[in-house]
Amino acid sequence: VTHDHDGAAEVADYLQTLGHRDIAVITGPADYRSAIERTQGFVGALAKRGIELPKARVIEAGYTFESGVAAAEKLLTSKKRPTAVFCENDEMAAGVYRVALRTGIQIPQQLSVVGYDDSPLASRLWPPLTSVRRDTRDTGRIAAAMLLQSGDAARPMASVRPHLVIRDSCQPPQ
């Protein structure tokens, strides 16, 4: 079991701690469990800190680079753009980087960006992307070991907690 809810809540806490209050989220597809958990975790953690996300700051996308570009165009070309964007995967975050570059918005000086999954792409973007790491190798290794150990017996649940990998894509808002 992965704890997408907790990973997204950690992002909300981090951005709020930096001083961001005008935050947007680019979600995955509404029918994906991971997107539901990430969105609930993120929005819930912000609400606990007194930050409500307007509907215009929550944009559903498709976990692709192209959908990240489309969502970022809506967010970053509006008169009042957010100071931070949480993307529920790194591909969509790369789409935000593309639009920021094209529109002259500097990351992180004018816009903080956080991704999810900590894919190899996260460390290759410039500046390197802050992202939530889900140790999928550990998850697979644990699951395989549990299958081998349990045979036909009831299988216990294993969980791997995500954690935020802080790189250079965030700073306090100007």
Question: Residue spans of the language-model regions?
Answer:
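Bacterial carbohydrate/catabolite-sensing allosteric modules
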Residues: 1-174
